[in-house]
């Protein structure tokens, strides 16, 4: 699904994967919907966590 991306994503990667704007990407990573890692001012997201969140969103919308 995200084979061309590293195992740890930054906000720009999340933005590209989901096809959303920068503001939306930052709102999402600050929403608490999934675990993020803060390294100084940098925000990192595990690719596997994002995939699980996406799959959960797909399952929730299917119901």
Describe the residue ranges of each PLM region.
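A short, Lys/Arg-enriched interface patch at domain edges and termini
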Residues: 50-63
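Polyanion-binding surface elements
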Residues: 1-24
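Intrinsic disorder/low-complexity detector
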Residues: 9-15, 37-40, 61-63
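Glycine-rich loops and low-complexity Gly/Arg-rich segments
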Residues: 2, 33, 61-63
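Alpha-helix boundary recognition
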Residues: 3, 29-30, 55
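Short, well-ordered alpha-helical scaffold segment located
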Residues: 24, 49-50
């Amino acid at each position: 699904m995200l084979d061309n991306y590293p195992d740890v994503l930054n906000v720009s990667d999340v933005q590209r994967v989901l096809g959303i704007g920068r503001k939306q990407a930052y709102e999402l990573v600050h929403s608490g919907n999934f675990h993020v890692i803060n390294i100084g001012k940098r925000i990192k997201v595990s690719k596997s966590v994002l995939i699980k969140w996406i799959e959960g969103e797909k399952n929730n919308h299917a119901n």
